[in-house]
Swiss-Prot record:
Keywords: Calcium, Calcium channel, Calcium transport, Cell membrane, Glycoprotein, Ion channel, Ion transport, Membrane, Phosphoprotein, Transmembrane, Transmembrane helix, Transport, Voltage-gated channel
Pfam families: PMP22_Claudin (PF00822)
Description of how the protein assembles with itself and partners: Interacts with CACNA1C. Identified in a complex with the L-type calcium channel subunits CACNA1C, CACNA2D1 and either CACNB1 or CACNB2. Acts as an auxiliary subunit for AMPA-selective glutamate receptors (AMPARs). Interacts with GRIA1.
Phosphoserine found at: S259
Region (Disordered): 235-261
Taxonomic source organism: Homo sapiens
GO biological process entries: positive regulation of synaptic transmission, glutamatergic; postsynaptic neurotransmitter receptor diffusion trapping; regulation of AMPA receptor activity; response to cocaine; transmission of nerve impulse
GO cellular component, one term: postsynaptic density membrane
Protein name: Voltage-dependent calcium channel gamma-4 subunit
Length: 327
């Protein structure tokens, strides 16, 4: 289900990228951004010697784009003229905002920049479909489409704001009522919507791919660790804790037995004799009461008395050593 949704998102992203670029390219290349009335088509405003046109003449209908204005009616019907954003009869302050707005409107930098970004974003989308493992390509495409949409909307705002500088030479009282926007303008606005949608989809695809890749890596790591033979062994921390506890127990047991008596027992009696004494008692355990004899009891008591005598002598020597040892 996730793969199906992602495939559908990728298909919509590809189609949206193509649609956004096509809409913006058509909008820039056509001259139907604005319908307005202009006196340029009947030749009344070609010379300024005759004065302004009569009030009844609103001008002939024209359609204009970003760079040209074309006449639909009048003497010059079917002819197109280059838009002059800076008429010679008007004086403009070069530091004014209107002059800067006319410069931006004349250059059409934002629509052109938007088209270039849309083209680059479409190329990134195509490369992302070819190199599906490269998630950064899809992210770059999303960023490019978002930037293209922002550039597009800025260009549209500038175009609307500079509508007073339209090539029609209408009087100020007629400028508010005798123009409307054409389908090229709406194509540009629709391109903005599609570009932003494609950008959001591309970023969403990148996020989902990143999550799936992280989950897959974690699952493979857990699977590899569970199948490893080291996973069946106790953990290092547990082993270290046990080793510490055992070392502490082994260190603590001599400390309990450290006493002059205990030390001198081992020092006074050789290990061979002690083992001999210990082994000498083994026959007593395995013999029965019928094999008891007074000679064996006398020999055992003699050994026991000897052991007690050596123990006392060793303890006496250790006490003397403790008294004579300087502090």
């Amino acid at each position: 289900m996730v793969r199906c949704d992602r495939g559908l998102q990728m298909l919509l992203t590809t189609a949206g990228a193509f649609a956004a670029f096509s809409l913006m390219a058509i909008a820039i290349g056509t001259d139907y951004w604005l319908y307005s009335s202009a006196h340029i088509c009947n030749g009344t405003n070609l010379t300024m010697d005759d004065g302004p046109p009569p009030r009844r003449a609103r001008g002939d209908l024209t359609h204009s784009g970003l760079w040209r204005v074309c006449c639909i009616e009048g003497i010059y019907k079917g002819h197109c003229f280059r838009i002059n954003h800076f008429p010679e009869d008007n004086d403009y302050d070069h530091d004014s905002s209107e002059y800067l707005l006319r410069i931006v409107r004349a250059s059409s930098v934002f629509p052109i920049l938007s088209t270039i970004l849309l083209l680059l974003g479409g190329l990134c989308i195509g490369a992302g479909r070819i190199y599906s493992r490269k998630n950064n390509i899809v992210l770059s495409a999303g960023i490019l489409f978002v930037a293209a949409g922002l550039s597009n909307i800025i260009g549209i705002i500038v175009y609307i704001s500079s509508n007073t500088g339209d090539p029609s030479d209408k009087r100020d009282e007629d400028k508010k009522n005798h123009y409307n926007y054409g389908w090229s303008f709406y194509f540009g606005a629709l391109s903005f919507i599609v570009a932003e949608t494609v950008g959001v989809l591309a970023v969403n695809i990148y996020i989902e791919k990143n999550k799936e890749l992280r989950f897959k890596t974690k699952r493979e790591f857990l699977k590899a660790s569970s199948s490893s033979p080291y996973a069946r062994m106790p953990s290092y921390r547990y082993r270290r804790r046990r080793s510490r506890s055992s070392s502490r127990s082994t260190e603590a047991s001599p400390s309990r037995d450290v006493s002059p008596m205990g030390l001198k027992i081992t020092g006074a009696i050789p290990m061979g004799e002690l083992s001999m004494y210990t082994l000498s008692r083994e026959p007593l355990k395995v013999t029965t009461a019928a094999s008891y004899s007074p000679d064996q009891e006398a020999s055992f008591l003699q050994v026991h008395d000897f052991f007690q005598q050596d123990l006392k002598e060793g303890f006496h020597v250790s006490m003397l050593n403790r008294r004579t040892t300087p502090v």
